[in-house]
């Protein structure tokens, strides 16, 4: 539409969506599996204070692989201490 006054031929009343590809790059299967986050679940952990042997309870939310890693840490050198013994 040009000029000071619109004319009927300048007005388009029907618009149709156009299929325009946003990106031509396809996602590899490996990239797709990396994009999916592992399922998070709540785990209750019960252990003892390493100094006074009082029971300690905590809840963590993590993936299955992460809870296995925490288990290995607790069986190894990681020691939990209660607030009284700090």
Swiss-Prot record:
One of its GO terms (cellular component) is host cell nucleus. InterPro entries: Papilloma_E7. Keywords: Activator, DNA-binding, Early protein, G1/S host cell cycle checkpoint dysregulation by virus, Host cytoplasm, Host nucleus, Host-virus interaction, Inhibition of host innate immune response by virus, Inhibition of host interferon signaling pathway by virus, Interferon antiviral system evasion, Metal-binding, Modulation of host cell cycle by virus, Oncogene, Transcription, Transcription regulation, Viral immunoevasion, Zinc, Zinc-finger. Signal peptide: none annotated. SUPFAM superfamilies: E7 C-terminal domain-like. Residues 1-37 are annotated as: E7 terminal domain. A motif (Nuclear export signal) lies at residues 67-75. Homodimer. Homooligomer. Interacts with host RB1; this interaction induces dissociation of RB1-E2F1 complex thereby disrupting RB1 activity. Interacts with host EP300; this interaction represses EP300 transcriptional activity. Interacts with protein E2; this interaction inhibits E7 oncogenic activity. Interacts with host TMEM173/STING; this interaction impairs the ability of TMEM173/STING to sense cytosolic DNA and promote the production of type I interferon (IFN-alpha and IFN-beta). The E7 terminal domain is an intrinsically disordered domain, whose flexibility and conformational transitions confer target adaptability to the oncoprotein. It allows adaptation to a variety of protein targets and exposes the PEST degradation sequence that regulates its turnover in the cell. This is Protein E7. It comes from Human papillomavirus type 10.
């Amino acid at each position: 539409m040009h000029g000071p006054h619109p004319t009927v031929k300048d007005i388009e009343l029907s618009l149709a969506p156009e299929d325009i590809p946003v990106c031509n790059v396809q996602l590899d299967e490996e990239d797709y599996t990396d994009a999916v986050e592992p399922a998070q679940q709540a785990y209750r952990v019960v252990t003892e204070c390493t100094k006074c042997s009082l029971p300690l309870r905590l809840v963590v939310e993590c993936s299955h692989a992460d809870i296995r890693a925490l288990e290995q840490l607790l069986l190894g050198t990681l020691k939990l201490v209660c607030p009284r013994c700090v």
